[in-house]
Every structure is written in C-alpha cells, then in structure tokens.
Amino acid sequence: MKCRFEFEMNNLKEIYEFGEVAKQTNGSVLLKSGKTVMLATVVMEKEMVDEDFLPLTVQYIEKSYAAGKIPGGFVKREQKPGDFETLTARIVDRALRPLFPKGYLYPTVITVMVLSADPESDLQVLALNAASAALFVSDIPVRKAVSGLRVAKVDGEVLFNPPLSKLKESTLDLYLAGTKEELLMIEMAAIGSYKTEVVPTTVDPLMDPTLAEEVITIKEPNAMKEEELASIIAQGKDVIQIACNEYEKYFIESAKEQLELELLPQTIDEDIWTYVEEIYAADIKEAVQAMAKSERNELLKEIAKKISEDDVAKEQGWEYETIYKVVEKYKRKIVREMILNEGKRADGRGLKDVRPIDIKTNILPSAHGSCLFTRGETQALVVCTIGEKTDAQMYEMLTSKGPEYEHFMVHYNFPPFSVGEAKPISAPGRRELGHGNLARRALEPVVDVPEDKTYRLVSEILESNGSSSMATVCGGALALKAANIDLADLVAGVAMGLIVEDDKYAILTDIMGLEDHDGDMDFKVAGTHDGVTAMQMDIKLGGVQQEILEQALQQAREARLHILKIMEEAAEKIEINEENLPSSHTITVHPSKIVDIIGQAGKTIKEIIEKFEVSIDIDRDKGKVKVTGKNRPKVIAACDYIQEITNKPKPEPVKFQEGDILKGKIKRTTNFGAFVELPGGVDGLLHISKLSSGRVERVEDVVNIGDEVEVEVLSQKGHKIELGLRQVLKKA
C-alpha cells in the first residue's frame, strides 16, 4: 500500500514515501528533505545462522550523481566506501542494533543510498531516520522508531538540526539517537574556535622599527562543562521522544504484518549450571580475580576442561563446548554480583579506581614525537609526525564544491597480536576508522595547526584490555607535546561502564575488556581540565536514564583529572628530539633583494636548496622568505647564507659594447631561444629569431647545450644582454 507522510519538526522537513520503490524487500522507504532523496531498504534471510551475535550489516552509500558529479580517478564508478560513508554506517548500526529481539539470528542487511543531495542537509541524521523508518514498516519484529538529532551551539544558543552552513559556526557538535523511551547512542565533539588579541609589534623588524599593533589569533578548545552537556542532552532527549511518537503514530499505517520468527536466545543447560554453581563457583570466582587477562581466560578454560573430565560430566554426556558456555555465563554472573553487591571488581579495584598508568615519551629516536602510554593491560604507542601543507589528506564530500584538506589526522591501528591472536595484520576496518575519528575529535579542539603545516598521529595498539581509543587520546596529546607542538591544554580520555540489575546499578571507571563484554554500557569521555571535548556512548540495555548519564559524566571527570595530573608530570620530563624536528624560519628582506636570492634563471635559489637540503617559499611583495627543512642547523645556515647574499652590495653588471664579438657556451635552451654563458660568468639571450635568417621551428635544430658559439652583442640593459649568432649576422 502506497503511503506518503510529511513531518515538520525540529527545523527538519521530511517526506516519507512507502510502497513506491524497492517493493521486493522486507521494508523500504523513500525519504525526501529539501533536495535530498534517500532510499532505505531492509532485507532479511529466511534461514538462521549459528552465531552468538546479531548478524546485522548496515551500508550507507553515496552516489556521485546525487550531487551531479562523475567519480574521479581512472575508474568512473563508485568504489569502496569513503571514511564519511563508513562512519555514517556505524552510526546507523549502533543506533538500530539494540532494537532487535534476543535470539534473532537471521542475516539482515540495511542499505541506505543517497540518490540526491542537498548541500544544507545533514545526511547522517536523515540516514538514520530513513533506516529506522524502513525497519519499522518491515515485517521484521521491530516496532520502535528511532530518531537522529544534531545539536549545535551558536553564539550561546542551542539549535536542533541546524543547516550545515550554520553548524560551521557552532562550538558544539552533538549527535543523539534514541526511541520515545530512552537514548541509545551519543556522539559529541567540542569545536575549537579562535579569539583575536592585539599585541604590540614593529612595522618591519629590519626595514622599519616604527611601533605598530598586530592582531593575533589564539585557539580556544570550547570544552563543555559536564552540567551544561547533561542539560543539553536532556533537551535533545525530549525532542527525540516527540519525534518518535509522531513517527510511530503514522508509520504504523504502512507497517507490514510481522513475521512469526523462531528466535533462539542463548540458553544454558540448567543441570550443568546447577552443578557448576554447587561445585565450582569458588574456582570460577578465583579465576575471575586473576590479575592478567590471558591468565583469567586460561583458568576458565582449565575449569571447563576439569568439569568435562569428572565422573558426573562423563555420566551425563556433557560436552566441553557446552560446559565452557555455562562457565562463561556463570563468570558473567559473578563479575556483575561482585560489582553490585561488594563494590569490588575482578582486578580488585573499587568502582571509581583507574588502573596503574605508565608513560614513556620520545622512545623512538628518529620520530618527531612519540609516547608509549600504558594503562593496566592496555598499551598504545602513539607517534607524531610534522609535515608540510602539501602533506595534508585531500578528500571530497558529496556536496562540497571542490577538494578539501585535512591538516590534522589520527590513524588508529589494532593489530591482532594486541589481543594474542595469531592472525596477519589487515587493512583498517570500521572499528579502526571509528576509534581514530573519536580520538581526532577529542584532540582537535586543543591543536592549532599552522596554515603551512600538517600533523599526523598514528596509534599502534600493542596490548588491548579495554579503552584503547582513550589510551590513544592520552598518548596522542603527549606525542604532540613530545614533538614540541603547543596545545591549548592536555586532553585525557577514560572509558566508563555500567552494570544494571533490576533497581540496582553501578557505574564503573576505566573499564577493562571483561567489564565491557559483561557490562551494559560503553561510555567514552575525553576532555581537558575545563570540560568535555569528545564523548561516545553505546548502550546495550535499550536506553539509559538521565540520572545515570549525569552521574557517569561526573565520575568520568574525577578520573580525567586524575589522569591529567599524571600526564602533566610526564609532560614536564619530555626531552625534545630537536635534531629530528623539521624546522621553519622566516626572514624579512627588502623586496628589491628578492631577485638576488632567486638569481639569474633561478640559479642561486636552486644552489641554496641543494646545498642546505631545504625548501624555500618567497612572498615577493612583503619580502618574506620562508626556509623549511628536516635539519634545524641546516635551516639556520641557509637563512644566514640568504642574509649574506642580501646584505652584499649589488655587483656592477659586466659591461659590453654594442657590436662586441664574444665566444660563449650554450648553457640552457628554451622554446624562445638559448642562454649563452659569456666571459665574466654572465648570461645573454640568443633569441630564436637570431639563430637563422629563415624560420626556426626548434632551437635545438640549430644549437644544443654545450655548443660553443660566436655571438655579437646587440644590446645591453643592466644584466639583460641580447645576442645574435655571428655567422648569421655576417651573412646578413
């Protein structure tokens, strides 16, 4: 049945069309907003798979034709998803995954395709809304609508779903997703801004010492206080609830009859459970409290093996795999009971305790800056490299008018050996891109990248037992400091967890892998002394209460300040690798001296570049000469050499008389003539028209580099000497 619904809520006008296209799917919708058109489809396999996780795949695909473009490169088809597409697919996946019923083991694919794009549309908000609508009206047993919401803060005013042009003025980028009952997902980033200050200076330190004023810009992180952030999230939650109520009220008219699916929630053998509880509970609790992750896992396997070999197990015919599942399930029960009833965690910590932290900086002698950050059994080696403007990552958004450039990059790598897996390292996947993006958003507000520079951070996770993305944030901030880069403030991150049973709950600080696996929430918070710069929350319960969210934010703040204190102590001990750092110096000369630095046909500047291994950028109008190189002493030497050149009195040009006959050597050829090296080391131009009495197509048809020729001086103006080929002039 065809249905069309229009909504205008929260600065967003949407039109949903059901039953019009893609009718062979389990559910589909065409969503229109402004000039944006999206197709969302849901397809489910009929046969179940034997997995212990929800077999859900989400794709978000942007078509180039949606913005009137043809894909660049040699292959004129859309290729693998870009970073924005991958991150958007993750957002949709994380918001919708909690809605599926337990025991749902049917492979399901949700696809969102952008068919037309409006430059002012927030494609991530619309993608989630479209996917949720398609799932809601499908015959899959999910009857909850999810709404995405973008929240900005411009000039102190909170805005919901602002146009993208307005979002660029915001100091807050907050993305919320939830149902009419609770929030399911949060992504937040503070957006740094610049303030201007007027400072005293001189007109030109070399040429004009007159006092003047200069306007400078200072980076402000705009970290948000926990109380304000919690308040804005609460406002957003109310907005989402209203939207979801409206969606469900109308979408139900287009919803298909739900399939009666067989669900296979994970069950355990009650007899084995009872036996394990009576005989082996103490052994499992002892294994849970083993300090090392690998030791804990081995002990649990040994217990399962021990049970499988005893007489009762043999009599009952219990298999090892079945026993191990029960042991794992009982382990989860013990972990949660210890936390809720004893306030004690598997590794002996209290609920608010942070694992021991060890920090080493600049351990890589050839790198610009490095930090080995270890927290418990999680270890990140973060390395900073300083590049030039040309090293920036070029990318193009679907609706952008041209290429854009990323001058601050964070790349996160998670090799299998970090968790003891014997697998080869492969290309980064969605998880790596997501963690790198979170770390970048956490650090970006405090990093001020000069216009002519590019900073790249690479995080190599060497050990992982929870919170590796937050270790990347901590290590990244110190790696930047180790590369002698000024930060507006240090940034630290911590992962929070949640255990909920009936009316009891406990919030955990700095969760390890066990608590992430057996807990109900993964809540990552990063920030400075002043507030939060980035946050990411995923909930497994189907929602989180506002009270718990506020408490988790405050508890995260306490942990962050503790970590920042340790990081500050480490930062004070950093020994900068001065000899490794690229150096850049700008000197000011009189604009008339620029020609001396360049030299005839670029001879002098080329010699400087080759001799000192530097690059040189010149602003002719202002007389600014910027010298950049990988070796600081060579950069300084090049600057000294340039100043020597510009301070030397300009030599008088070698003077020739019109009609002088000279012998010279062809030094260089161009399409308009040849340059001849004359006595005294000066060059003269032998124009192509003077090479023959007739027409010459190519200079090389008459003379080549290295040829000795006899020429006649036709004219001289200063250093510019015009020559004629003697043998041609004699014939004339």
From Swiss-Prot:
Family per similarity comment: Belongs to the polyribonucleotide nucleotidyltransferase family.
Key words of the record: Cytoplasm, Magnesium, Metal-binding, Nucleotidyltransferase, RNA-binding, Transferase
Reaction catalyzed: RNA(n+1) + phosphate = RNA(n) + a ribonucleoside 5'-diphosphate
PANTHER family reported for this sequence: POLYRIBONUCLEOTIDE NUCLEOTIDYLTRANSFERASE, POLYRIBONUCLEOTIDE NUCLEOTIDYLTRANSFERASE 1, MITOCHONDRIAL
Species of provenance: Nitratiruptor sp. (strain SB155-2)
A GO molecular function held by the record: 3'-5'-RNA exonuclease activity
The protein, known as: Polyribonucleotide nucleotidyltransferase
UniProt binding sites for Mg(2+): D516, D522
EC number: 2.7.7.8
Job description of the protein: Involved in mRNA degradation. Catalyzes the phosphorolysis of single-stranded polyribonucleotides processively in the 3'- to 5'-direction.
Annotated CDD domains: KH-I_PNPase (cd02393), RNase_PH_PNPase_2 (cd11364), S1_RPS1_repeat_ec3 (cd05688)
Domain S1 motif: 659-726
Annotated localization: Cytoplasm
Gene (UniProt): pnp
Cellular component per GO, a single term: cytosol
Cofactor: Mg(2+)
